[in-house]
């Protein structure tokens, strides 16, 4: 069969019409160098700041330096397989991590990938790690407390839902323990917890997981880890990943608590990245935007209004406010709170809890220095009963410290001064608390009421701890319903004061101290 020229022409036209070529446009570049996890790329003319760059071997980098002729990017993970001349391409996406209730009880890395051996996440929700903080109109004033379970903190340095309270101190002063105990104390509350471990040993993180499991608190907690063996990029990004996981709960009208342990290591990781990218170093060799590194993270902690929640959920949730509370941890060197990173974070947060080595070594745990520890907004959220019964504790301790310093130089003290010093010692002893043993509101109220009303005056200093232990056992059996009401309502009135007085009077009559 022979085809004439007309038929051939028609056949070619038909094939041209039917031909379908899907063209995909890539913005490609070529790796110029790979040094210490930093890659320099020629090309990528359309890349965005913070965009993910697809690398060979199913790995990714994040673009941080956008220069005239090349792009500086940091590799997320191992980079030994990367060599000069390899092709890379833009993805058009910012880094996203999984969010939602399915993460509760799981241990994930910075990218939200589970590392606890419990299988894949059943999750369909993702969110970019960099989001804008709620503006002033979208926020609501802080009016509800977060109970840490520590008498000294809940009484003198109260923390509210939506607050940012810095925990600062030298190494081995109990900073992480305080944070972990705060998580343990939320096990029966509606607060979801996120613990972000930055630059820590894997064995340390394993101990934290075991403690949370022992106290049945892991079920309500997400642990985000970037260990010391992980790349600096993952250590730098870990707090933002943890923050966005907490923001999800805030935005749907729930309450979340995020702990960054610790931001000093994140700052060091970011300094390392910046120096490798050849950015100009500033004070202590940190880059010029180190303040912005922490401010854009901590400003995302807030209590948001019901309108904000309603808008975010597209009308599905109405009349509920949400909150994200942040407890960043900063490690100081030899108690120097005036160095660069500590002063930056102090100026960003709503207060700080300062833990002192000298107090810790003297056996005062938690080693809180009430003189320079402060909560700027938490008092508005403090439970009424705790606020009332602890009103004089800070003053008592301040007078005690002043008189104790004075007594070291004075040979003879009058009776009033001696009494004040002795009572200050007893209050200090009463505020001591063992780790992983948080106290309920009612227990704190009872013990602080005893201190405030002078019931410790006739008790020997060495018997203070026994007095507290036996008093709490006594009320647990004799006044269980009364204590439950205080835990639920937190109110304080004449009837409650009368009952508290009756409890302690009866206890002291029956017990001998």
Curated annotation (Swiss-Prot):
UniProt membrane topology term: Peripheral membrane protein
Binding locations of ATP: 169-176
HAMAP family registered for this protein in UniProt: ATP_synth_alpha_bact
PANTHER family assigned: ATP SYNTHASE SUBUNIT ALPHA, MITOCHONDRIAL (PTHR48082:SF2)
Assembly and binders: F-type ATPases have 2 components, CF(1) - the catalytic core - and CF(0) - the membrane proton channel. CF(1) has five subunits: alpha(3), beta(3), gamma(1), delta(1), epsilon(1). CF(0) has three main subunits: a(1), b(2) and c(9-12). The alpha and beta chains form an alternating ring which encloses part of the gamma chain. CF(1) is attached to CF(0) by a central stalk formed by the gamma and epsilon chains, while a peripheral stalk is formed by the delta and b chains.
Function: Produces ATP from ADP in the presence of a proton gradient across the membrane. The alpha chain is a regulatory subunit.
Record-given protein name: ATP synthase subunit alpha
Species this protein is from: Baumannia cicadellinicola subsp. Homalodisca coagulata
Lineage: Bacteria, Pseudomonadati, Pseudomonadota, Gammaproteobacteria, Candidatus Palibaumannia
Gene: atpA
């Amino acid at each position: 069969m022979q085809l004439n020229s007309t038929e051939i022409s028609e056949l070619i036209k038909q094939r041209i019409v039917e031909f379908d070529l899907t063209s995909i446009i890539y913005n490609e570049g070529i790796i110029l160098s790979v040094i210490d996890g930093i890659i320099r790329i020629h090309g990528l003319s359309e890349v965005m700041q913070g965009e993910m760059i697809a690398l060979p071997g199913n790995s990714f980098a994040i673009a941080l330096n956008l220069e005239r002729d090349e792009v500086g990017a940091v590799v997320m993970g191992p980079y030994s397989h990367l060599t000069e001349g390899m092709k890379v391409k833009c993805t058009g996406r910012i880094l996203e991590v999984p969010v939602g209730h399915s993460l509760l009880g799981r241990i994930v890395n910075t990218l939200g990938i589970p590392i606890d051996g419990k299988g894949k996440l059943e999750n369909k929700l993702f969110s970019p790690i960099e989001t804008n903080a709620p503006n002033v109109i979208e926020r609501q004033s802080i009016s509800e407390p977060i109970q840490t379970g520590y008498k000294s903190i809940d009484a003198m340095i109260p923390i509210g839902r939506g607050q940012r309270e810095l925990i600062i101190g030298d190494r081995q002063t109990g900073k992480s323990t305080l944070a972990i105990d705060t998580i343990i104390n939320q096990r029966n509350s509606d607060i979801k917890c996120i613990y972000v471990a930055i630059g820590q040993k894997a064995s340390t993180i394993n101990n934290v997981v075991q403690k949370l499991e022992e106290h049945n608190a892991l079920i309500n907690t997400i642990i985000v880890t970037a260990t010391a063996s992980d790349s600096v990029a993952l250590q730098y990004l870990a707090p933002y990943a943890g923050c966005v996981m907490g923001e999800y709960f805030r935005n749907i009208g729930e309450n979340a608590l995020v702990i960054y342990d610790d931001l000093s290591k994140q700052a060091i990781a970011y300094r390392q990245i910046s120096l490798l990218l050849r950015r100009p170093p500033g004070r202590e060799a940190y880059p010029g935007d180190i303040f912005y590194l922490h401010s854009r993270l901590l400003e995302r902690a807030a209590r948001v209004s019901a309108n904000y929640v309603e808008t975010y959920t597209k009308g599905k949730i109405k009349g509920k406010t949400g909150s994200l509370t942040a407890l960043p941890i900063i490690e100081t060197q030899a108690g120097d709170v005036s160095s660069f990173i500590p002063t930056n974070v102090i100026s960003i947060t709503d207060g700080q809890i300062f833990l002192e080595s000298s107090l810790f070594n003297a056996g005062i745990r938690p080693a809180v220095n009430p003189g320079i520890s402060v909560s700027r907004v938490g008092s508005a959220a403090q439970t009424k009963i705790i606020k009332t019964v602890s009103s004089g504790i800070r003053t008592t301790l301040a007078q005690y410290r002043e008189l104790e310093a004075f007594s070291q130089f004075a040979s003879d003290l009058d009776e009033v001064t001696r009494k004040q010093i002795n009572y200050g010692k007893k209050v200090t002893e009463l505020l001591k608390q063992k780790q992983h043993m948080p106290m309920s509101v009612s227990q704190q109220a009872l013990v602080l009421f005893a201190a405030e009303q002078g019931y410790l005056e006739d008790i020997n200093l060495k018997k203070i701890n026994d007095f507290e232990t036996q008093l709490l056992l006594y009320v647990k059996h004799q006044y269980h319903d009364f204590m439950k009401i205080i835990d639920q309502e937190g109110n304080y009135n004449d009837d409650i004061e009368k009952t508290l007085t009756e409890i302690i009077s009866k206890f002291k009559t029956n017990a001998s101290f």
